[in-house]
Each structure stands twice: as structure tokens, then as C-alpha cells.
A protein has these predicted regions:
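Sec-dependent signal peptide recognition
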Residues: 1-9
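Formylglycine-dependent sulfatase
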Residues: 3, 14-312
Length: 312
């Protein structure tokens, strides 16, 4: 996690020195290392997410915290979560100390426009709110869980707004508008997706593809697996992959893909018992399956295509 934060700070330092790449950060919520076709899952295809590894670098042994808020806080600051005051995921334990600075603060100081579109989970009130942490624009929700994924009420810069559609599609729309609006200036676009975190809810067209799908790869302890929950997770990730593809297509359309760093990872292990590379553990566990995450970084011309990083 400190390595990932260091990469961001190096990019920010380059911006201060004159080189100003855009930065797009895509964060999955409760996706396991094994939830991607790139990592051997044969039950779904994630071509757009996989392309980030194929066209950039993938980190084979990247580790995060076993639950949401600590990982997010460490990523935002490059510091260990307990030093930030983050000791849990609710009742105020998810909040970072007000004195902490985030990478959004640093990018903003370097002249970037900054936006976040999705789940925050590091404090809801000022001075813990995203707008107090270096972000110019916020669409999403600040809590760790949202009960409705269709036509959900979402916050836009302090005002609650009723959205229309599936939450991942809606928030991707907002991120695309942000990129389009700021195409002529350097931007930091942080998209912490809400899926595959529960509630297990997905658009009908995605569910139709997976509702009767035989599961050919199962959890280490198959009796603990709920097949329909796994099928819904697969559908949610297929939807997420499609939205990643929309973001990548927008960068290409605007001729920004060679000037943009794109990062993808997950905040912890899988939220249910399902295939995860045959690793023991899931979300909430410090076993490998609970803390090992995918990490893909694409920066054309700077990162060698297909590079593999084996170091922890």
C-alpha cells in the first residue's frame, strides 16, 4: 500500500516539476484477487480491467487491509491506518485525524482539479468529508454501506440528489462528465466503485447472463459458498468491467490515454466464500485470501506493457 501511495506521490512530484499526467484511480469494493479472468477465473470475463495489466504492470503480491476503511485511509495518505486514527469501519472509527494530508491535497496543490465518484468511507462530517480532504467535487456516499443500488439517493457536494439507474452506471456517468469537462487541464479522478459489496443487486441484463451459470470453480470450503450470491457477484463484476471500459474509451476518445495513469485495485478480500485462487480467507481475515488484492497500473510510454512485479 505504501508503494502504491509512493507511485502517486511521484506522479504528483512530476506534476510540480512540469510533467502533468492525469490520474484515474479505480477501486473495487470487496472484490477478491480471484475475481478476474486475468487471475484465472474462468467463470467470467473482465477484459477491460484485464487490459490494464496487459498494457501496463500487474503486481503479483500486493496486500491491503482485511476491511474497507483502513485500506482506504492508508491509500489516501501512504501511512499506516492506526497512525491516522482509523481503527474500524463504523461509529467514528473510520475517520482519519483532521491533521492528515491526502494525495488529493497534494495533487490540488500541484494545480490539478480533483474529483471523487463513489464510496468514501473515511468520515461523513466536516472536517472528515471528501471536500475537506482535497477533493473539489464529490458524487456518491460517505458511509461504508448503501442500502439501495437502483435510483439511489446520492450526495453531490453536500446536497442529496435522487439518481436514476444502477449506482455503478450513474457514478461512472458522473466520472465521465468530470473527465470531459476537465480534458484541457490535469485532473485526478478517483472512482471507488460500490461493487461487489452488498446488497447483492445488479441490472437485469447482467443477472440474466449469470443466474443459471454452472459454477466450475468454488470456494476452498464449498459448503460455505452460496451459489446465487457468487453468481450475483460475477454479474456485478461484469457490470463493473463494462464501466471500466467506458472510462478507458473516454480517455481514448479525448486523446488522453497516453497522458493518463490508470490504477485499479480492491480494498480487501472477497465478501463471500467463493473461488479466490484457492487461497484461505476472505474479507475480515488476515489469511492471504483476505488481504491479497489485484493491482494493475497502466501508464503508456512509462510502464512496460505486461510487466510483472513480484515484490511484496
Amino acid at each position: 500500500m505504501r508503494l502504491l501511495s509512493t507511485i502517486l506521490l511521484l506522479a504528483c512530484g512530476g506534476a510540480m516539476a512540469g510533467e502533468r499526467p492525469n490520474v484515474v484511480i479505480l477501486l473495487a469494493d470487496d472484490a477478491g484477487w480471484g475475481d478476474y479472468s486475468f487471475n484465472g477465473n474462468r467463470q467470467l470475463a473482465t477484459p477491460h480491467i484485464d487490459s490494464l495489466a496487459q498494457d501496463g504492470a500487474h503486481f503479483a503480491r500486493f496486500f491491503v487491509q482485511p476491511v474497507c476503511s483502513p485500506t482506504r485511509a492508508e491509500f489516501l495518505t501512504g501511512r499506516y491506518h492506526r497512525r491516522l486514527g482509523v481503527t474500524g469501519v463504523s461509529t467514528g472509527q473510520e475517520r482519519m485525524n483532521p491533521s492528515e494530508k491526502t494525495f488529493a491535497d497534494s495533487f490540488k496543490a500541484a494545480g490539478y482539479i480533483t474529483g471523487i465518484f463513489g464510496k468514501w468511507h473515511n468520515g461523513s462530517q466536516w472536517p472528515y468529508h471528501p471536500l475537506a480532504r482535497g477533493f473539489d467535487t464529490f458524487w456518491g456516499y460517505t458511509s461504508g454501506h448503501w442500502g439501495e443500488y437502483f435510483d439511489a439517493p446520492l450526495e453531490h457536494n453536500g446536497v442529496m440528489v435522487k439518481s436514476e439507474g444502477y449506482i455503478v452506471d450513474v457514478l461512472t456517468d458522473k466520472a465521465l462528465q468530470f473527465i470531459e469537462r476537465n480534458k484541457a487541464r490535469p485532473f485526478l479522478c478517483y472512482v471507488p466503485f460500490t461493487t461487489p459489496h452488498s446488497p447483492f443487486s445488479v441490472p437485469p441484463q447482467d443477472w440474466e447472463r449469470y443466474k443459471d451459470k454452472p459454477l466450475i470453480q468454488t470456494a476452498v470450503l464449498p459448503k460455505e459458498e452460496n451459489p446465487d450470491a457468487t453468481r450475483c457477484v460475477l454479474a456485478m463484476l461484469a457490470n463493473q468491467d463494462r464501466n471500466v471500459g467506458r472510462i478507458l474509451a473516454k480517455l481514448k476518445e479525448l486523446d488522453l490515454e497516453n497522458d493518463t495513469i490508470v490504477i485499479y485495485f480492491s480494498d480487501n478480500g472477497p465478501n463471500t466464500a467463493r473461488w479466490n485462487g484457492n487461497m484461505k480467507g476472505k474479507k475480515g481475515s488476515v489469511d492471504e485470501g483476505g488481504v491479497r488484492s489485484p493491482l494493475f497500473i497502466r501508464w503508456p510510454g512509462k510502464i512496460t506493457r505486461g510487466a510483472k512485479v513480484d515484490a511484496i
